């Protein structure tokens, strides 16, 4: 992203367009639940008839509808936080064409197998309405397939070539690639990053055309060539649970965890704050009585703290306010990465949030082929509604308590996903602290690793 593009796109040269007046707009996509929930026992309507926290139904795929790797899935709608369940999910088989069709002889010689195959699981946690999450669920896998097909020649090579289509300009090109340490997995990571960016642009166009607003986080797992790639943009989370190990597979991106990046942007482009916010962080919101006093603060270049004398400009609302799950960017948004939010502005202002948001995911690679897998080794992916009330250790305890005693049950991973959600609802046998209930939408995938590569009978 060039500085020139950034200035043209986000900085005042011309006045920002006035906010759209409220009014009815057609959604760019119809509201729906994930395709693999069709035929499930709970009604697929927009909202459940009863939304009391103690009576919200948990939904899972119907018996006989098998997800990739026999993964389990469950979800629950929020407790009257919004009209719709703003979470979305998608999963299926990735079929990546290995080369373009040419003469039959060339095809038979170069491509003994037409497709490189993998699997895909994704969770999208929407905000500001369900539209962005639905668009992401409909779009991201197609973006990823296109990006992977563009680099498939490098994926199937022993070492990614410097040039595609077999060209070699410099005899030492393979050495340069080797010295850079470029591997096939780096091409998959690049494809994921580019797919997120492409999907973000699609969502922006669709929502703008329909006069809609909204965004979503995205947590995506991709299995390809014996490795599991976990791409995260937002505050959903994935962990690997084994008999003697709990391994985080994602990092949560919030205004607090990305404070320095966000402050740095405000330092370079102060116009983005429109004179209404201070980029500096203080332990609390400053008051008039703090003027002239030396107080603790930190800026974009600081991981530690120092003291400064309070000036009038320091009394403005902080760029990042609150801590933990309560931290907000420009008093508005609880995440710093995701898809969408192109039209989002601070209430009653023309101050845009999109310049501070990234659609680029962090990608973690799990080399599944190198693990000595046990039958009960699983990856748990969930939106933040689960992690708001359950820790990694509590989730792992539930996994280890349930799976060993149910190894003959073909639906055990689905039942485990349901049990994890029930544990967020404050039941008497729940692990959560007394009275601790998740009122948010909650969506969970439980992906067993022992059956990796097993074909799904229904995608």
Curated annotation (Swiss-Prot):
Residues 14-27 have a biased composition (Pro residues). It is found in: Nucleus. GO terms for biological process: protein dephosphorylation; signal transduction. The keyword Methyltransferase does not apply. Keywords: Hydrolase, Magnesium, Manganese, Metal-binding, Nucleus, Protein phosphatase. PROSITE patterns: PPM_2. Mn(2+) 2 binds at residue 125. Binds 2 magnesium or manganese ions per subunit. Residues 38-48 have a biased composition (Low complexity). Residues 1-64 are annotated as: Disordered. Residues 1-10 have a biased composition (Basic residues). Mn(2+) 1 binds at residues 125-126. Its cofactor is Mg(2+); Mn(2+). Its EC number is 3.1.3.16. GO terms for cellular component: mitochondrion; nucleus. SUPFAM superfamilies: PP2C-like. It is an enzyme of class 3 (hydrolase). GO terms for molecular function: [pyruvate dehydrogenase (acetyl-transferring)]-phosphatase activity; manganese ion binding. It catalyses: O-phospho-L-seryl-[protein] + H2O = L-seryl-[protein] + phosphate; O-phospho-L-threonyl-[protein] + H2O = L-threonyl-[protein] + phosphate. Residues 162-459 form the PPM-type phosphatase domain. Disulfide bonds: none annotated. Belongs to the PP2C family. This is Protein phosphatase 1M. It comes from Homo sapiens (Human). The lineage of its organism: Eukaryota, Metazoa, Chordata, Craniata, Vertebrata. The gene is PPM1M.
């Amino acid at each position: 992203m060039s500085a020139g593009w950034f200035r043209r796109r986000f900085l005042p040269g011309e006045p920002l367009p006035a906010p759209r007046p409220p009014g009815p707009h057609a959604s760019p996509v119809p509201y729906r639940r994930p395709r693999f929930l069709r035929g499930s026992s709970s009604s697929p309507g927009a909202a459940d008839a009863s939304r009391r926290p103690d009576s919200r139904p948990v939904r899972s795929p119907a018996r006989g509808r098998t997800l990739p790797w026999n993964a389990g899935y469950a979800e629950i709608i929020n407790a009257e936080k919004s009209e719709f369940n703003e979470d979305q999910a998608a999963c299926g088989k990735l079929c990546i064409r290995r080369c373009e069709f040419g003469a039959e002889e060339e095809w038979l010689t170069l491509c003994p197998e037409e497709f490189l195959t993998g699997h895909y699981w994704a969770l999208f946690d929407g905000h500001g309405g369900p539209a962005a999450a639905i668009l992401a669920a409909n779009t991201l896998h197609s973006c990823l397939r296109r990006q992977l097909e563009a680099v498939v020649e490098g994926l199937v090579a022993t070492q990614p070539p410097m040039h595609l289509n077999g060209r070699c300009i410099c005899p030492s090109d393979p050495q340069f690639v080797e010295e850079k340490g470029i591997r096939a997995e780096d091409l998959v990571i690049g494809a994921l990053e580019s797919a997120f960016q492409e999907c973000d642009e699609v969502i922006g166009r669709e929502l703008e055309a329909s006069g809609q607003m909204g965004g979503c986080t995205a947590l995506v797992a991709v299995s390809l060539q014996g490795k599991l790639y976990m791409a995260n943009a937002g505050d959903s989370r994935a962990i690997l649970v084994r008999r003697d190990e709990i391994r985080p597979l994602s990092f949560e991106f919030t205004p607090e965890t990305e404070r320095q990046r966000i402050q740095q942007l405000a330092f370079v482009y102060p116009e983005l704050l429109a004179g209404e916010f201070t980029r500096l962080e203080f332990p609390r919101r400053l008051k008039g009585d703090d003027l002239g006093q030396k107080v603790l603060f930190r800026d974009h270049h600081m991981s530690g703290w120092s003291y400064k004398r309070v000036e009038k400009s320091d009394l403005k609302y902080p760029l990042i306010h609150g801590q933990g799950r309560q931290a907000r960017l420009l008093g508005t948004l609880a995440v710093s990465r995701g898809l969408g939010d192109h039209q989002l502005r601070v209430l009653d202002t023309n101050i845009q949030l999109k310049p501070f948001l990234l659609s680029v995911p962090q990608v973690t690679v799990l080399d599944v082929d190198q693990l000595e897998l046990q039958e009960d080794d699983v990856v748990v992916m969930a939106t933040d509604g689960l992690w708001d009330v359950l820790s990694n250790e509590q989730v792992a305890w539930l996994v280890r308590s349930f799976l060993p005693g149910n190894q003959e049950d073909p639906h055990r991973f689905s039942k485990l996903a349901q049990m994890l959600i029930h544990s967020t609802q404050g039941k008497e046998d729940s692990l959560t602290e007394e009275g601790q209930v998740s009122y948010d939408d909650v969506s969970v995938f439980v992906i067993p690793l022992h059956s990796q590569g097993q074909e799904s009978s229904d995608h």
